[in-house]
Swiss-Prot record:
This is Chaperone protein HtpG. PANTHER family: HEAT SHOCK PROTEIN 90 FAMILY MEMBER. Homodimer. Residues 344-564 are annotated as: B. One of its GO terms (molecular function) is ATP binding. PROSITE patterns: HSP90. Residues 1-343 are annotated as: A. It comes from Nitrosomonas eutropha (strain DSM 101675 / C91 / Nm57). Its main location: cytoplasm. Keywords: ATP-binding, Chaperone, Cytoplasm, Nucleotide-binding, Stress response. GO terms for cellular component: cytoplasm. InterPro entries: HATPase_C_sf, Heat_shock_protein_90_CS, HSP90_C, Hsp90_fam, Hsp90_N, Ribosomal_Su5_D2-typ_SF. Residues 565-640 are annotated as: C.
Length: 640
């Protein structure tokens, strides 16, 4: 860092430079958004001033009329966006403007693919905000003063976006922020009142602050329009959510979504409702068309804004919606909460609990409408919703007991019914196809669809034509631990506990199984002795029709798949041993009944194969290979 007089020269972090280059390249085809982003920042600054002004009216400095001004200068080739919002101190400029790189920046950059359309969406989700100015400007000058600080505490930030920026302390009479864009050579088309007004009305008409521009008047002498001193408001400057629904176009709904969500695509669906009665509030809630890159970061909750009587209060969505709906964007505006409400009061507020419950009801209702609609457009939207947010919605089964049945009804899975990759099977679909004598909903969990489809546990179910749900999302182990039944039918893992097919198994089969258990009792006891602490026990199975053996967890033990998931997350896994179940009709098992010399090797190979078949890892792969090679060599030498 160099210091010369009052000017500091500082460098961007390397990742920030890279992100700036990527952003300018990826977003250039949608360059108009620079104005939307800068107006959004100005609007946020006004919201913050209103909020802080509730407890300290002196911050208004005798200038309570909040507005945003847009101006341009053809000769200087500049566009200026200014506001009289909260402004920034020197440290806030460094924190908010001087530091573009935030946690996750490196991982975010690595996720970019070179596909311009996809990368533009990802960059929008990451939040470019102020830095979108560099799409059209080769130099940006920001001058600001925080409300409450004296005029000599102004700060000027300047950068060409190439790797460094300068900071200096300046005199600034008015509070707020002014951003001057020095346009690139090929951006002169933006130096037009008509063009700027068009962009403002397209992207920022819903901003509740007036956006002011000077009028242009015709000058007879020069035969051209000239900028006058008279000002006018360009946007509607009214809260879109407070207007009647029939006065709002779909395009206006979409543009407001892009403003609150910092997205470039229209949303998938929205719900706009005015709630009256004990509680009075307005909801305008959106479901995005794609998941944000940080969807699985449960700590990041800034999608939903709370307003009280049109005054922004907070965007801590945890108080307003449960974690499993963290993808929802939009606003809630209450007429009942006191304006000076604190976050602590909100945490304990029954009014907030009521608003939260009402919002959950609306969002689930919106998803249900898509799921049950006869319209192909809505059906396609639900498919997109499930693909993007289905795993997160599954969290609700554990988190939201009061809505568990509604959430369960929305869940979608793959199954052995058609075995397609897309998750389209609902629990109601499964129940409708159950055999008349079937009492349970059968499922299997695995770490991937292929692993689930090829599981040996499915063999008896395929033979009998019984459908099994194939659960292969990481969240599914948590889901099934919290969803024990649905519509009066219990859910049963086919890889845990004793196999109980109930009325699906006839008396002849039961008698045959009992006889086989007796016939193989000596063999199973001998195998248990050889395998020792690797297994809880060895027993005859009725699950298998083709494979020689499989592993089964005890009823109340953790499944092998869950144990592997926890281990991969670095968590401690409680000790539990599986049952080894062997197929009495398989040639390998029948041979083992009469094997003496290589009995231990055959027993270990059956166990290791069963472990591999369920996706497990061998503790000693070298011993497995040695045993297998010995047995193969023995067969070759014996001519078998």
């Amino acid at each position: 860092m160099q210091t010369a007089e009052n000017v500091e020269h500082l460098n961007f972090q390397a990742e920030a430079k890279q992100l700036l280059r990527l952003m300018i390249h990826s977003l250039y085809s949608n360059k108009e958004i620079f104005l939307r982003e800068l107006i959004s920042n100005a609007s946020d600054a006004a919201d913050k001033l209103r909020f802080e002004g509730l407890s300290d009216t002196a911050l208004y400095e005798s200038d309570p009329d909040l507005k945003i001004r847009i101006a341009y200068d053809k000769e200087a080739r500049t566009i200026t966006i200014s506001d009289n919002g909260i402004g920034m101190s020197r440290q806030e400029v460094i924190d908010n403007i001087g530091t573009i790189a935030k946690s996750g920046t490196r991982e975010f950059i690595d996720s970019l693919t070179g596909d311009q359309a996809r990368d533009a969406n990802l960059i929008g989700q990451f939040g470019v905000g102020f830095y979108s100015a560099f799409i059209v400007a080769d130099k940006v000058t920001l001058t600001t003063r925080r409300a409450g600080l004296t005029t000599e505490h102004g700060v000027r930030w300047e950068s060409s976006g190439e790797g460094e920026y300068t900071l200096e302390t300046v005199e600034k009479r008015d509070r707020g922020t002014e951003v001057v864009l020095h346009l690139r050579e090929d951006e002169d088309e933006l130096l037009s009142s008509f063009q700027l007004r068009s962009i403002i009305r397209k992207y920022s008409d819903h901003i509740t602050l007036p956006i002011i521009m000077k009028k242009e008047v015709w000058d007879d002498e020069s035969k051209a329009y000239k900028i006058s001193d008279e000002e006018e408001t360009v946007n509607q400057a009214s809260a879109i959510w407070a207007r009647p629904k029939n006065e709002i176009t779909q395009e206006q709904y979409d543009e407001f979504y892009k403003h609150v969500a910092h997205d470039f695509e229209p949303p998938l669906a929205h719900v706009h409702a005015r709630v009256e009665g004990k509680q009075e509030y307005i909801q305008l809630l959106y479901i995005p068309a794609h998941a944000p890159f940080d969807l699985f970061d449960r700590e990041h909750r800034h999608g939903l804004k709370l307003y009280i009587k049109r005054v922004f209060i907070m965007d801590d969505a945890e108080k307003l919606l449960p974690g499993y709906l963290r993808f929802v964007r939009g606003i809630i505006d209450s007429n009942d909460l006191p304006l000076n409400v604190s976050r602590e009061i909100l945490q304990e507020s029954k009014d907030i609990d009521s608003i939260r419950a009402g919002s959950v009801k609306k969002v689930l209702g919106l998803i249900e409408d898509l799921a049950t609609s006869d319209k192909s457009e809505d059906q396609e939207k639900f498919k997109i919703f499930w693909r993007e947010f289905g795993q997160v919605l599954k969290e609700g089964v554990a988190e939201d007991y009061s809505n568990r049945e509604r959430i369960a009804k929305l869940l979608r899975f793959t199954s052995t019914h058609d075995e397609q990759e897309e998750q389209t099977v609902s629990l109601d679909d499964y129940i409708a196809r159950m055999k008349p004598e079937q009492e349970k909903i059968y499922y299997i969990t695995a770490d991937g669809l292929k692993a689930a489809q090829s599981s040996p546990h499915l063999e008896i179910f395929r033979k009998k034509g019984i459908e099994v749900l194939l659960l292969h999302d990481r969240i599914d182990e948590w889901l099934t631990a919290n969803l024990n039944e649905y519509a009066g039918k219990s859910l049963q893992s086919i890889a845990k506990g004793d196999l109980d097919l109930g009325k699906l198994e006839d008396e002849v089969e039961k008698q045959e199984h009992e006889k086989e258990a007796g016939d193989f009792q000596e063999l199973t006891a001998k195998m248990k002795e050889v395998l020792g602490e690797l297994v809880k026990d060895v027993r005859i199975t009725y699950r298998l029709t083709e494979s020689p053996a499989c592993l089964v967890a005890d009823t109340h033990d953790m499944s092998g798949n869950l144990g592997r998931l926890l281990k991969s997350a670095g968590q401690k896994v409680p000790d539990s041993k599986p049952f080894l179940e062997i197929n009495p009709h398989h040639p390998m098992v029948q041979r083992l009944k009469y094997e003496e010399a290589k009995f231990a090797d055959w027993s270990h190979i059956l166990f290791d194969q069963a472990l591999l078949a369920e996706g497990g890892q061998l503790e000693d792969p070298a011993s497995f290979v040695r045993r297998l090679n010995d047995l193969l060599l023995q067969n070759i030498l014996s001519g078998k």
